[in-house]
Regions:
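Feature activates predominantly on carbohydrate-active enzymes
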Residues: 2-193
């Protein structure tokens, strides 16, 4: 068996094609030539780890499955909240989660499941070895109840938008977001690689 491609990544995807052929022909490969290339540059999915926590082991296994099917992007939805209607119309009772460790905002990280910065860095590196680009998503200005539970001053008017919206007229919101994003994007060893 010979796999040829114009890039290293192309050779890797060729190994996925070979694995699929072996899976579909368990009694041996037929003699011949196969030509395979993606129709779309971006082939991915999004997983909501905010509303439903998934362990790092699960995410790593998921990356391997995506790689087998030659997907190349996985968006990780790191923060979100439930719907106030399901929590007695009380924003203070409404479930909210932020799944990534934060040193700059102690207490922001969800207690019912989260990832350390080092785990998330390692996960992105592992995914890259399988041809998957991890796209971390911090959802703002809506779906931000975890942030407004942490600091209620960040919330928009509850009547017009709901407490899960950040008030974009407040300087405190921009200070908070600048600090939060800087924690994950800056430095010699950023969390989002």
């Amino acid at each position: 068996v010979t796999i040829e491609a114009s890039t290293v990544k192309g050779v890797f995807w060729g190994t996925r094609t070979l694995l699929q052929m072996i899976h579909n022909q368990p009694f041996g490969l037929m003699k011949g030539k196969a030509l395979d290339y993606p129709q779309y540059a971006h082939r991915g999915l999004m997983i909501d780890v905010a509303r439903k926590f998934f362990t790092m082991d699960y995410l790593q296994d998921y990356v391997k499955i995506l790689s087998f099917y030659k997907m190349n992007e996985l968006q990780i939805h790191l923060n979100d909240n439930g719907f106030v209607e399901f929590f007695d119309n009380d924003w203070n009772k409404t479930y909210a989660a932020f799944r990534l460790e934060s040193d700059r905002f102690p207490g922001l990280t969800s207690k019912d499941g989260s990832y350390t910065k080092e785990e998330f860095r390692n996960f992105q590196q592992m995914a890259a070895r399988y041809g998957i680009n991890i796209i971390p998503e911090i959802d703002v200005p809506a779906h931000s109840l975890a942030f407004t539970h942490y600091n209620p001053i960040l919330a928009a008017d509850k009547k017009e938008y709901g407490m899960d919206h950040l008030d974009l007229y407040k300087k405190e919101v921009y200070d908070f977001l600048d600090t939060l994003f800087d924690e994950y994007l800056s430095g010699d060893h950023p969390v989002f690689v």
